[in-house]
């Protein structure tokens, strides 16, 4: 199942990415779920087929990578390409095993550009 990690210290660019993702979903009332917790509701959403569209999208907002561990474990066990999951995380530690589970194409980092020359 496609999963992507999105983080950075530039909130404008992170929000722009989040808004772009929202606009890409056909029939968002059925195929888009944005949440900050992972419960039975989110699991049921992930296991349903997309309605009136070709894919579903889960946007998970978290403060730290630790909050994403349960989500990533569940996604790794699923065998479906119908759901794309985007994990928006405020603080990321690149040294963790969890971070290393994401492939190079699955990580989007948005940082402020320094003006020093």
Question: What positions do the PLM features span?
Answer:
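Non-catalytic interfacial helical region
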Residues: 2-117
């Amino acid at each position: 199942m496609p999963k992507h990690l999105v983080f950075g210290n530039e909130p404008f660019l992170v929000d722009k990415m989040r808004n772009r993702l929202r606009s890409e979903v056909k029939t968002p009332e059925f195929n888009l779920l944005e949440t900050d917790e992972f419960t039975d509701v989110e699991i049921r959403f992930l296991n349903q087929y997309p309605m009136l569209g070709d894919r579903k999208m889960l946007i998970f907002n978290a403060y730290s990578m630790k909050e994403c561990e349960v989500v990533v474990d569940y996604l790794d066990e699923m065998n479906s390409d119908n759901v794309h999951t985007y994990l928006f995380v405020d603080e990321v530690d690149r040294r963790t095993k969890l971070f290393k589970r994401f492939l190079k194409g699955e990580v989007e980092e948005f940082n402020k550009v320094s003006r020093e020359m």
